[in-house]
Amino acid sequence: AGMLQAHPGGRITTAALAQQVGVSEAALYRHFPSKAKMLDGLIEYAEQTLFDRIGQIMQEQDSAEPRCHHIVLLLLTFVERNPGFARLFAGDALQGETERLRNRVCQLLDRIETQLRQILREHRAQQAALPDYQVNPTANLMLALAEGRIQQFVRSNFRQLPTNGWPEQWALIEQSVFTEPVN
């Protein structure tokens, strides 16, 4: 993941990866049958890390607003702390790689959106007095906002942090989705 951060827009070769880790290419291939499997391992690590923490958020938070907020903030903070993963999530690091890897990242992000959708669906069922919104577009908006912040982070060569301005942006979502209308 560090190499993905250090070489924005560039492809990572197995030779460069072997040199970075301090082993031979042959040693890498003894553990991973292909470069695609190496990238797949990174995606699997990200998925496991994110969904373990999402499970904790679901247990620790008892209402929809903090659950959604913490899940989206988790994604932004994860890529901010691990910029190489931002390139994976933005698709930048997967240019020229197999379609299966791109689909794997899409599946990971889709799972996050599905989690947001489920939280919002339960929230709508419990809170009839809240502003009327459609669950699917709202969950999609939350994830699209996070993906846009990740893309800006990659495009700025990791200078424009995804969490900069996040409290103000979330306040807009919170106001339109979770705040009871004033009569």
Segments (PLM) and residue ranges:
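Alpha-helical structural segments
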Residues: G2, A6, Q19-Q20, K37-E60, ...
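Helix-turn-helix DNA-binding elements, focusing on the entry/boundary residues of the two helices
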Residues: M3, T14, E25
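Hydrophobic/aromatic-rich alpha-helical bundle segments in the mid-to-C-terminal region
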Residues: A86-G91, R102, C106, R124-I173, ...
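Helix-loop "lid/cap" segments that line or gate small-molecule binding pockets
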Residues: L73-E80, L88-Q95, L172-V177
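Conserved amphipathic alpha-helical interaction elements at protein-protein interfaces in regulatory
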Residues: G2, A6, S34, Q56, ...
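Ser/Thr-centered, proline-biased regulatory motifs
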Residues: G10-A16, A36
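Short hydrophobic/aromatic patch on the recognition helix
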Residues: G22-F32
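Helix-turn-helix/winged-helix DNA-binding modules
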Residues: G9-G10, R30, Q59, L130
